């Protein structure tokens, strides 16, 4: 293992700390709820869902966090302004944790930013994400909101190399007038969480691991990803899924360890149902990493799996 020469930022999001040197803080884990075709969702457009089942899933994640010491956030996914509003209200009611607001639609993300500001929850919200598709209206909505935490996505549709992704953050890579980090500054983002972006296996998925290290070395911001998207988009693995669902689940969940070993600070681990497996696995990695850097003058915080489970 290693220690970064660059001072590493530690972001504080509603009491949850993320970032720092490898082995210093436990990995922050975020499970996704209300995702596409989630069985608990009854009407994705209106945001109708089985409330009892949803609360059990949130509690499952919180239980994993209580057991291992790994902090957690709830990754909310919505496709319409109506649905994401209902989802935010529900998560705020049943949990005190920070939450990510995510949608494939920019106007929906912008609406969510305004809504959490209106109801006084902006300090708990993480915008997901500032990316190369951001336009003027979305920037304006984010700038006018009270949100100060956001994921900055390093996806570059023209150049998925390490250089292309880094340039997207720093300069806009010739596709934007300025880099995404600069845009984040203009939008009032203090807590910048860098996500290198996960492309399919065979199309540069592993570059995200290298970029995690490169980004932390260059800027010092907390960095992580939704690395499970690599195995979940793996054609070979998907062909095995019907024959052996356990094999699929092992690869999907196991990818968590790869991101942690590459100095990841946070992980969007996919379906929140996987919490009962992800938290012990992430805790195991955190313990081993903390032990690996013990002689590098890196001391784990009190609330760390090494102090909970060893």
From Swiss-Prot:
Q: What class of enzyme is it?
A: transferase
Keywords tagged on the record: Methyltransferase, Transferase
According to the record, the segments passing through the membrane are none
Enzyme Commission number(s): 2.1.1.-
Q: Name one GO biological process term.
A: methylation
For this UniProt entry, the molecular function terms from Gene Ontology, in alphabetical order, are: methyltransferase activity
Family as reported in the entry's similarity comment: Belongs to the MtrH family.
Question: Can you state the subunit structure given in the record?
Answer: May be part of a complex composed of 3 subunits; MtxA, MtxH and MtxX.
Q: What is this protein called?
A: Putative methyltransferase mtx subunit H
Annotated source species: Methanosarcina mazei (strain ATCC BAA-159 / DSM 3647 / Goe1 / Go1 / JCM 11833 / OCM 88) (Methanosarcina frisia)
């Amino acid at each position: 293992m290693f220690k970064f020469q660059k001072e590493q930022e530690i972001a504080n999001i509603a009491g949850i700390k993320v970032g720092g040197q490898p082995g210093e803080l436990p990995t922050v884990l975020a499970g996704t709820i209300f995702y596409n075709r989630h069985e608990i969702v009854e009407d994705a457009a209106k945001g109708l869902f089985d409330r009892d089942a949803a609360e059990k899933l949130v509690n499952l994640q919180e239980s994993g966090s209580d057991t291992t010491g790994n902090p957690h956030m709830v990754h909310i996914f919505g496709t319409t302004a109506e649905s994401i509003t209902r989802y935010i209200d529900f998560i705020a009611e049943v949990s005190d944790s920070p939450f990510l607001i995510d949608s494939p639609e920019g106007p929906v993300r912008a609406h969510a930013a305004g809504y959490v500001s209106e109801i006084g929850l902006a300090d708990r919200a993480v915008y997901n994400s500032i990316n190369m598709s951001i336009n003027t209206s979305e920037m304006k909505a984010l700038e006018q909101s009270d949100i100060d935490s956001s994921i900055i996505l390093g996806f570059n549709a023209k150049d998925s190399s390490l250089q292309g992704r880094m340039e997207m953050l720093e300069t806009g890579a010739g596709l934007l007038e300025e880099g995404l980090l600069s845009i984040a500054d203009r939008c009032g983002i203090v807590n910048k969480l860098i996500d290198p972006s996960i492309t399919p296996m065979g199309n540069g998925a592993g570059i995200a691991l290298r970029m995690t290290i490169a980004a932390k070395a260059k800027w010092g911001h907390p960095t992580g990803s939704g690395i499970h998207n690599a195995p979940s988009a793996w054609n070979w693995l998907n062909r095995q899924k019907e024959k052996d669902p356990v094999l699929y689940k092992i690869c999907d969940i196991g990818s968590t360890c790869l991101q942690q070993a590459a100095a990841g600070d946070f992980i969007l681990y996919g379906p929140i149902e996987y919490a009962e497996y992800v938290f012990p696995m992430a805790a195991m990695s955190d313990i081993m990493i903390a032990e690996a850097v013990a002689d590098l003058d890196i001391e784990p915080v009190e609330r760390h799996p090494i102090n909970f489970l060893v």
